[in-house]
Each structure stands twice: as C-alpha cells, then as structure tokens.
Amino acid sequence: MDAAAQESLILELHAIEAIKFGTFVLKSGITSPIYLDLRALVSHPGLLSSIATLLHTLPATRPYDLLCGVPYTALPIASVLSVHRSVPMVMRRKEAKAHGTAKSIEGAFRAGEAVLIIEDLVTSGASVLETAAPLRDQGLVVADAVVVVDREQGGRENLAANGITLHSLMTLTEVLAVLLKHGKVTEEKAREVRQFLDANRKVTVPGAAGAVKPKAVRKGFAERAGLAKNPMGKRLFEVMEAKQSNLCVAADVGTAKELLELAEKVGPEICMLKTHVDILSDFTPDFGAKLCSIAEKHNFLIFEDRKFADIGNTVTMQYEGGIFRILDWADIVNAHIIPGPGIVDGLKLKGLPKGRGLLLLAEMSSAGNLAHGEYTAAAVKIAEQHSDFVIGFISVNPASWSVAPSSPAFIHATPGVQMVSGGDALGQQYNTPHSVINDRGSDIIIVGRGIIKASNPAETAREYRIQGWGAYQSSLP
C-alpha cells in the first residue's frame, strides 16, 4: 500500500467519523484518548470494498485456504473479501450453540487447511487469539492475521509469541501524522495521543483469554531418547537419529508377499513400517517372523495400525491371540481412547512385559472426523497417566493443541503426507513433509500411496526421507 493510498484511506475513515478523540475504555481495559470505530463501514459499501481489496494486497507468510473475520466488526470486511476473491470463509461463534450442531466454527473446512484471520484493529491481540484458538482446536492452521489499524500497543508482539504474524494497512502513528498534516487534529491532542502510546506500548492480553500457547522449542531426537520412559519409545528415537530418518511408510498392500517385498525396498530409508495385517489375503503364521527379520536387517520398527477400540479384556485377546498374534511381532500398536483408559490397561498388561509401545489416536487425517478438541485433550491425559507404555500419538496438528503433553518424550506421527498437499475422493487429506514437521509440530511423517504407488518405491522413499529429515533439522533452534 503506497503512502498516497494510505493517506486517502485515513482521511475517508475520519470523514465517516470512524476515528474519534476523547476518553474511551478499550477491550484491553486501558483508557485511550483516541478510538477507532470501524463499525460505520457497513453504511459505506464503497469504502468497505476498498478496504477489503487493500487487505488482500498484504503479503501473508504462507498461502491460505480460508478466511475468518473476528466477530463482529471484521465480519463484513471478511465477507466482501471472500466474495471479491472467491476465497471460502468460516465464522467463529463467540459462544458455541447449545442446540443444533453446537459448533464453535461454522462453514466447510478440512483439518490442515490454512486460515487468514481478518480484524479491524489490534491493540493487545486478544480478539485475534480468541479466534485463533477454536480454529486451531479444529485442526486448522493459523499463521497470519491482517488488520486495518495496528494500535502499536503490543498486539504484534503478543501474536508473534503465539505463532501469528500481523500485517496491517496502517499504524496509529501513521493515522495521527496524516490527521495532523491535514488539520484534522490539534497539535495538543496529537501530543496527548503520542504520550499515551509511549506509555502503553506493551498491553498484555487480559487474563490471557483465548491465548494459544507459544510454539514450544523443539528438542532433538537424541535428547528426547534420554527422556523416554518406555524402552520402545527410546529405541524409536535412537533409530531415527542413527538413520537420519523420520519416515514411516504405510504398507497398505493387499498381500503379505507384496508387503515383504516393499519392506526390503524401503527398509534402508525408514524408521518405521506401518502395517494392516488384517488386509493381507495370503497371511500365514510365519509372516511375523519374516517381517521381523527384514526389520532387524534394515534397523526399523514395525507398527501394526490395528486401532484397537474395545474394552480392556477384549483388546488383550485381540493383541495376544487370534490368527495374527500381533504381540509376537509388532513393536508398536495404536488405539482409540473411546472406551476410556481401560483399553490402555488391557494392552499394557501384555505389551509392557515384552517392551512394546503404544500410540494413541489423538487426531485423524480424514475429513469430518471427530477426533479433536476435548477428545484430543483426553488422549493427552491418558498418555501422561500411562507414560511407561504410551510412547506418543497419531496426530495431525499437535502445534494447535490447547492442552499439550508435558513431556517431549511423547512422539507425534502424522499420516496423510505427500510431496504436494491435497486430498482424495474418500476424504483423506494430504500435507507436505515441511508443513507437517515445521507448521504442525509433528515428528514422524507417515507416507503411503506417495511411495507404494511410485514406479521406484526405494528411490521415492529416499526423497521423502531427505525432505522429512531436512524439515526436522530446520525446525531445531
């Protein structure tokens, strides 16, 4: 935005009395000699349209898929921008409905999509954070916010501490300079406003309401291995460090023959192989021993994606017995927490004596899934209560969790990874290695079709390993 356009916009805002001088109590609780009331924009469609267009020109740190206006003044701005640029919009409810769908976020969206927050003005950043929190709880990525006016009172810094970059059309200092230049404010009043700004440069978020935790400083895998309470969790970190690989291949093939051949091809590049033994049409009792031999040869762990979801007694039998005898050959299994903590007790009863580990399904990568918010928080609580057996989580966007694990010993593995983001006809959502590791705070990328459908799975696995490990290294302090 050039200086002439900015000056014209400031004068137009003053002309519609959107800029006022006097004594005003702000949302942050402080008393201000200047107040910006952009609610008047709804009565001036031409100016509203111009502001929406100008906000679109502000550069975001990453491409975005959705818009979300902060309730309520920014909603018409976001709506106009959505229509002008054909960018879908979602809406945050200030309070979730107690009836109907009881949603906190309205609109069509998919976990992993990036949202640009739109606000009229920012003081402490509290309103933006209050909007970012429920968006992130739904698995959406919030990295940027655009605003008409930055009051320069700590909002930019508060948002940055919570992983959000603020982009503004103008600052309060620039507003004051233009109004003074055109005789719209006296020098005495301008001095009063400048003194007010100097005295209130760091306004904190009131009560930290809606604040998202600052992005945690990532510890290296070698250091985290020393923190692990479970031997398999420790070994996984050690394998990752030794092979410089945070790649897990999802071997979703139809026969044991195909799976064993794939394991030989990709084994040198992976830290873990994910199986679905119950889809193998030619399964035989010696399958586990054959796979373990390949895993030992190439130094990777075996993760049976069983997704246990029954009561403790039943999962104990499913784990140890049946025709698959998963306990005998799978280093790691996973489970839903729908039945409650008893499912972990049942699996631990058999798995812990053999040094096995468990991943809890805290989130899923399919569109419309219900594993988020309180469900995810419950998974974290159960994991911390069973940290001797639970080694981590199947996650989609752990950086957005409002309740994060207290220990970095827990590992995050994220499915639905491909070189290019997108989705399939059955609702699976794909994200890139860099996005999963850097933006979403995961540790392991789980890649299926991107490798197993490739003409050269070994070479493709190597490319994914290099990308995944590079993303991990770039995320370290």
Curated annotation (Swiss-Prot):
Keywords per UniProt: Decarboxylase, Glycosyltransferase, Lyase, Multifunctional enzyme, Pyrimidine biosynthesis, Transferase
The organism's place on the tree of life at top rank: Eukaryota
Listed under catalytic activity are:
orotidine 5'-phosphate + diphosphate = orotate + 5-phospho-alpha-D-ribose 1-diphosphate; orotidine 5'-phosphate + H(+) = UMP + CO2
Q: What does the record give as its pathway?
A: Pyrimidine metabolism; UMP biosynthesis via de novo pathway; UMP from orotate: step 1/2; Pyrimidine metabolism; UMP biosynthesis via de novo pathway; UMP from orotate: step 2/2
Q: Does the keyword Transit peptide apply?
A: no
> What CDD domains has UniProt attached to this entry?
OMP_decarboxylase_like, PRTases_typeI
Question: E.C. number, please?
Answer: 2.4.2.10, 4.1.1.23
Does Glycosyltransferase show up as a keyword for this record?
A: yes
Q: Name one GO biological process term.
A: 'de novo' UMP biosynthetic process
User: What SMART domains does the annotation carry?
Assistant: OMPdecase
Report the GO molecular function annotations. orotate phosphoribosyltransferase activity; orotidine-5'-phosphate decarboxylase activity
Write out the catalytic residues in the record: 307
What the record says about family reads: In the N-terminal section; belongs to the purine/pyrimidine phosphoribosyltransferase family. In the C-terminal section; belongs to the OMP decarboxylase family.
State the HAMAP family in the record: PyrE
Q: Which PANTHER family match?
A: OROTATE PHOSPHORIBOSYLTRANSFERASE, URIDINE 5'-MONOPHOSPHATE SYNTHASE
Query: What's the name of the protein?
Result: Uridine 5'-monophosphate synthase
